[in-house]
Curated annotation (Swiss-Prot):
This is ATP-dependent protease subunit HslV. Protease subunit of a proteasome-like degradation complex believed to be a general protein degrading machinery. Keywords: Allosteric enzyme, Cytoplasm, Hydrolase, Metal-binding, Protease, Sodium, Threonine protease. The keyword Zinc does not apply.
Length: 176
């Protein structure tokens, strides 16, 4: 059975970055969990990572990113590049089905199994089934209001939860 889930959104404004995710996990046509935690702080609280896709795969990739962060002393960009290289070249890792969104004080990155590391033009990034809805809402709020990063994440995730059937309104939000 295919496991679908998640909207993860990151917004940076005025030196603060907020990353939020919903808590829904869907198996087939049933919601099996409402309060899953899909974002974590890594490397002494200096990096926030969220995942979309298979939970086991996402957690495995988070662990590997954490090891790379330790190896590269918290340098998110270098750790992400090395993770993406490993992910693309390793026969086992290539089968993992997840996307990572990782942020620190300087960078906001989408990391994929294709070897992609994408940093957005504007300080708004989203992944997952409701990611496009959350990103559109966040960009509108970012461009047209003075809301904080956290407020933009909250309001945008709420909008995504009203549109995407794989996204609920049980949010976890972390800030750095």
């Amino acid at each position: 059975m295919e496991v679908k889930a998640t909207t993860i959104l990151a917004v940076r404004r005025d030196g603060k970055t907020a990353v939020g995710g919903d808590g829904q996990v869907t198996l087939g046509s049933s919601v099996i969990k409402h309060t899953a935690r899909k974002i974590r702080k890594l490397y002494k609280g200096q990096v926030i990572v969220g995942f979309a896709g298979s939970a086991a795969d996402g957690l495995a990739l988070m662990e590997r990113l954490e090891a790379k962060l330790e190896e590269y002393r918290g340098n998110l960009l270098k750790a992400s590049v090395q993770l993406a290289k490993d992910w693309r070249m390793d026969k086992y890792l290539r089968r993992l089905e997840a996307l990572l969104l990782a942020v620190d004080r300087e960078h906001m990155l989408l990391i994929s199994g294709n070897g992609d590391i994408i940093e957005p033009d504007e300080p708004v990034l989203a992944i997952g089934s409701g990611g496009d809805y959350a990103r559109a809402a966040a960009l509108a709020l970012y461009r047209n209001t003075d809301l904080s990063a956290r407020e933009i994440v909250e309001k945008s995730l709420k909008i995504a939860s009203e549109i995407c059937i794989y996204t609920n309104d049980k949010f976890v939000i972390e800030e750095i």
